[in-house]
Amino acid sequence: SRQLAQESARLETEASQTMATVTSADGRVTITARPTGAIESVRLQSGAAADLASLGVTITETIARAQRVAAEKVLVSMEQTLGADSPLVAAVRQDVDTAFPQVGGSTIEYR
C-alpha cells in the first residue's frame, strides 16, 4: 500500500512536469503542450504568415498533435507502473482518445 502511494505520487509529479513539443510537417509551426491540453508555447518560423488561412489550420492541427503526444507520454508512464491491462490505464486512454482525437479528419473537436 505504501509502495502504491509512492508510485501514485511519482506519477502525479511526472504528469505535472510532462510536456511535448511538436513541429508541423511544413516546419512553419512548433507547439509545446502539456497532457492537460494547456499550451506552453507557439512558435512560428519567419515567413509563416504568407498564407494566413492555411497557417490557422496548421496551428490548430499542430496544437492537437502536441496535446495528444503529451498525454500519451503520461499513458506510457502509467502503463509501465500499473501495467498495460490496468483498468485505470484503460479509462485514462479512453479519456485521452476523447479529449485529443487523432488529427487527420476534416474537423478537430474537443469536449
Predicted regions and their residues:
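Acidic, negatively charged sequence signal
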Residues: 1-23, 48-111
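A short interface-forming secondary-structure element
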Residues: 38-52
